[in-house]
Amino acid sequence: MSLSRSEEMHRLTENVYKTIMEQFNPSLRNFIAMGKNYEKALAGVTYAAKGYFDALVKMGELASESQGSKELGDVLFQMAEVHRQIQNQLEEMLKSFHNELLTQLEQKVELDSRYLSAALKKYQTEQRSKGDALDKCQAELKKLRKKSQGSKNPQKYSDKELQYIDAIGNKQGELESYVSDGYKTALTEERRRFCFLVEKQCAVAKNSAAYHSKGKELLAQKLPLWQQACADPNKIPDRAVQLMQQMGNSNGSILPSGLSASKSNLVISDPIPGAKPLPVPPELAPFVGRLSAQENAPVMNGVSGPDSEDYNPWADRKATQPKSTSPPQSQSKLSDSYSNTLPVRKSVAPKNSYATTENKTLPRSSSMAAGLERNGRMRVKAIFSHAAGDNSTLLSFKEGDLITLLVPEARDGWHYGESEKTKMRGWFPFSYTRVLDNDGGDRLHMSLQQGKSSSTGNLLDKEDLALPPPDYGTSSRAFPTQTAGAFKQRPYSVAVPAFSQGLDDYGARAVSSADVEVARF
C-alpha cells in the first residue's frame, strides 16, 4: 500500500469517528426525545382508555338491570373485559418500549460521546507516532545517502543504508496496518451502534406483535357472538316474555303508589271491618245472566291510572239495568280469549298522579259474565288453603274445595261465594282459586288489570252489603314501598295488577310514531 493510500484511509477512519460523534449521536438523542413524546402520548391513550372502558362498564350495568337488555349488559361487560386485556398488553408493550429501548439508548448515547472521543484521540495519537517514526527513518536515510555521495569510499555507507531501508519498510508497514485496523475498528463501532438500535427496536416490535396478536385472538373469538347479540333490536328475550306471561297469568297484582280504593279510603283489598256473613243479596238477581252489550271489548277487572278517566267513578254509579245480552257464540269467544287480550283504552293525555281516579272502576268482565250466563252460577276450585280466623265475613276452605260464586264479579280481588263442602258463605281472595269449565276441568283465571278490579258497581255500593275485614293487616301506605319480590310468599296481591309490575320497564305508553323513530338506534 502506497503512502497516499494510507493517508486516504486515515482520513476515512477519522470521518467515520466524526460521523458517529457529530451526526449519529445527535440523531440518536433526537430519536430518544421523540420516543419519549410517543411514550407520553401512549400513556395518555392508556389513561383515557381506562376511563372509556369504565364508562362502558357503567353502560353494561345499566343494561344488566333491564329485563329486555340483560344479555346486552353481559356483552358490554365482555367487551370491557376483552379490551382491558388488550390494554394490559399495550401497557406491556409500553414497558418494553421504555425499558428496553429508550432507557438503554439514553444511557448508551451519554457514555458513547466520551468513549468515541477517547478512541479517536488514541487512534490519532498512535497513527501520528507511527508516521513520525517512519518520517524519521526516511530523513536518516536521506542524510546517509548524501554522505555516501560525497565520500571517496561509498561502500562504507552501503550496509548502514540497507539497514535504514529495512527500517523504513517496517515502519511503513506498521503504519499502513495500523491505519487499516483503525478504519476497520471505526466501521465496526459505527455498525455496532446501528445494530444495537435495530436490536432494541426488534424487542419493541416483538412486544407490539404480541399486543396485536392478543387483540386479534380475543376479538376474533368474541366479535361474532357480540354481533349476534345485537342483530335483532326488536327481539324481546324469552326471559322477559316469560316474565310478562307470568305477570299476565296472575289474577292479583301490586298496587301502584297513590291508589286507594273504597269510600272508606281503605286499600282495595282491605275489607270493611265489623261486617257479618253475607247472604246472597236480593239485588243480585237482575245481574245474573244479564250483561250489557256495551261490554263487548274484553276488559280485565279494572283500570286505574292516567288512562282511567274514560270510566265512571264508583261513587257516582247508579243502579242501572243492562240493556241486552251478547250472543252466546260471541260471549264464548270472548271467554276463550280472556287470557290473551289486553284492555282496550282510548289514548288520553297522561297525568302525573293517580289520585283523581282512586274511586273509578270499569264495567264487568265480559268473559266472566259469559260464564255466569252459560252456567247460571260459576264454580271455582281452591288451589290454596284460606283460613278466615275469627273474622266472620271471610270464607275458610282447604285446597281442592269447590266454591259456588254468588256474585257476578270480584270486588277489588275479593269474591263472595258458598263452599260446597261446608255450605258456609263469605268473602275469599279470588286469586286463591281456579275457575272450573263446563266439563268440570279447572283453568287458571287471569287478570291483566292495571288498577282496581271491576265490580258489581251499584250493587256493592249499598251500605247494607258488608265487605271482608282488612287483608292480613296490610295498610294502604305500605304498598308504595313494596316491590314484587315481597309478594312471592303467596300469590300476587289481590289488590294490584301483576302486569303493572313490569309494564313501565317495557315502555308500554302511548307514543307517537315520530317519537319511535327518534328513539330507534
From Swiss-Prot:
Record's keyword annotation contains Membrane: yes
Pfam families listed in its UniProt record: IMD (PF08397), SH3_2 (PF07653)
GO molecular-function term, one example from the UniProt record: proline-rich region binding
Comp. bias regions, Low complexity: 321-333
Cellular localisation: Cytoplasm; Membrane; Cell projection, Filopodium; Cell projection, Ruffle
Polar residues compositional bias, start-end: 353-368
Keywords assigned: Cell projection, Coiled coil, Cytoplasm, Cytoskeleton, Membrane, Phosphoprotein, SH3 domain
SMART domains: SH3
Entry's Gene Ontology BP terms: actin crosslink formation; actin filament bundle assembly; plasma membrane organization; positive regulation of actin filament polymerization; regulation of actin cytoskeleton organization; regulation of cell shape
Membrane-protein topology: Peripheral membrane protein
Segments for region (Disordered): 297-370, 450-471
Stretches assigned to coiled coil: 132-153
GO CC terms of this entry: cytoskeleton; cytosol; filopodium; membrane; nucleoplasm; ruffle
Positions of modified residues (Phosphoserine): 262, 324, 326, 337, 347, 367, 385, 396, 455
PROSITE patterns linked: IMD, SH3
Assembly behavior: Homodimer. Interacts with CDC42 and RAC1 that have been activated by GTP binding. Interacts with ATN1, ADGRB1, DIAPH1, EPS8, SHANK1, SHANK2, SHANK3, TIAM1, WASF1 and WASF2. Interacts with ENAH after recruitment of CDC42.
Protein task: Adapter protein that links membrane-bound small G-proteins to cytoplasmic effector proteins. Necessary for CDC42-mediated reorganization of the actin cytoskeleton and for RAC1-mediated membrane ruffling. Involved in the regulation of the actin cytoskeleton by WASF family members and the Arp2/3 complex. Plays a role in neurite growth. Acts syngeristically with ENAH to promote filipodia formation. Plays a role in the reorganization of the actin cytoskeleton in response to bacterial infection. Participates in actin bundling when associated with EPS8, promoting filopodial protrusions.
Protein name according to UniProt: BAR/IMD domain-containing adapter protein 2
Lineage summary: Eukaryota, Metazoa, Chordata, Craniata, Vertebrata
